[in-house]
């Protein structure tokens, strides 16, 4: 059986996943995922992040294992290239520049735009056909193609609604989330301290701005999808060979000073004692590192 990827507290801490937003910008609905605060910045409870990431990765794995389609969505600058890279790595779909209203709920219109893109592609690749156009007309077609590619490159082969939506930054991608909710498409999403987790089926508390954090999430998502694909292919009698293992990250630990501890909440039941100890120790180690650096 394929091994679903996992992550530990140290990996999350090293990637800066625990850093939320300023306390003044928080969404009270995220209270249950917040461990405390430091210098007016909320600190995310990584014990819950570990547990909920595991649940989300299993959802991704099971979706692909059952031949489902996953749509990755994040149009923010720091996530755009990373989302495309890892979605392509695991053979899934993505939107990484601009979410066009109706991408899910008005698929007929989007399909028409994809058809237009494919026709432009076909024309521009046909040297004989291009002889019938002026240079200006060819330039106009190239510009139209490039504009369409920005929005549609990652979904041009998506023939129906996805079976799972994976989102980084629920605030920025609220239109995509609303459309998924209308169509009953389950949602995996990284939820920062200023996010609303209400419509998210598989929330992952974490920093949604740090490039290192985003790369870690996407690497895990892609690995889970690849493991699901491996199982799907095995069930079909196809030997895919060795799958690429999760790449170890050589990340530098972030320093965390003494925390002003908030009231403890937990939406993830039965966080084991080992995880509690690991989290407390990781924070203490980071604290000691900072103190020694300042000595």
From Swiss-Prot:
Please report a single Pfam family linked to this protein: Ribosomal_S2
Q: Which GO terms describe its biological process?
A: translation
- PROSITE patterns, A to Z: RIBOSOMAL_S2_1, RIBOSOMAL_S2_2
Assigned GO CC terms: cytosolic small ribosomal subunit
Q: What GO MF terms are annotated?
A: structural constituent of ribosome
Xref: PANTHER family: 30S RIBOSOMAL PROTEIN S2 PROKARYOTIC AND ORGANELLAR, SMALL RIBOSOMAL SUBUNIT PROTEIN US2M
Q: Where is this region: Disordered?
A: 263-295
Note the Gene3D superfamilies from the entry. Glucose-6-phosphate isomerase like protein, domain 1, Helix hairpin bin
Record the organism. Answer: Rickettsia massiliae (strain Mtu5)
Protein name (database record): Small ribosomal subunit protein uS2
């Amino acid at each position: 059986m394929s091994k679903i990827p996992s992550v530990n507290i140290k990996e999350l801490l090293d990637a800066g996943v625990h850093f939320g937003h300023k306390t003044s910008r928080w969404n009270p609905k995220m209270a249950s995922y917040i461990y405390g605060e430091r210098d007016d910045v909320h600190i995310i409870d990584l014990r819950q992040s570990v547990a909920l990431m595991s649940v989300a990765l299993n959802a991704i794995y099971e979706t692909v294992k059952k031949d489902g389609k996953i749509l990755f969505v994040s149009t923010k600058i720091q996530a755009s290239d990373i989302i495309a890279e890892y979605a392509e790595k695991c053979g899934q779909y993505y939107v990484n520049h601009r979410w066009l209203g109706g991408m899910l709920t008005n698929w007929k219109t989007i399909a028409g735009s994809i058809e237009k893109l494919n026709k432009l592609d076909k024309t521009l690749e046909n040297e004989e056909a291009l002889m019938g156009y002026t240079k200006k007309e060819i330039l106009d077609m190239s510009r139209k193609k490039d504009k369409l590619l920005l929005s549609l490159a990652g979904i041009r082969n998506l023939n129906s609604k996805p079976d799972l939506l994976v989102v980084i930054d629920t605030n920025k991608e609220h239109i995509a989330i609303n459309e998924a909710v209308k169509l009953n498409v389950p949602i995996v999403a990284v939820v920062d301290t200023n996010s609303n987790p209400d419509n998210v089926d598989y929330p992952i508390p974490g920093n949604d701005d740090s490039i290192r954090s985003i790369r870690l999430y996407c690497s895990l998502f892609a690995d889970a999808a690849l493991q699901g694909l491996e199982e799907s292919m095995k069930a079909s009698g196809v030997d895919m060979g060795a799958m690429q293992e999760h790449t170890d990250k050589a990340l530098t630990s972030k320093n965390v000073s003494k925390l002003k501890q908030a009231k403890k909440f937990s939406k993830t039941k039965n966080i084991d004692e080992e995880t509690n100890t690991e989290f407390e120790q990781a924070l203490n180690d980071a604290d000691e590192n900072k103190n020694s650096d300042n000595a």
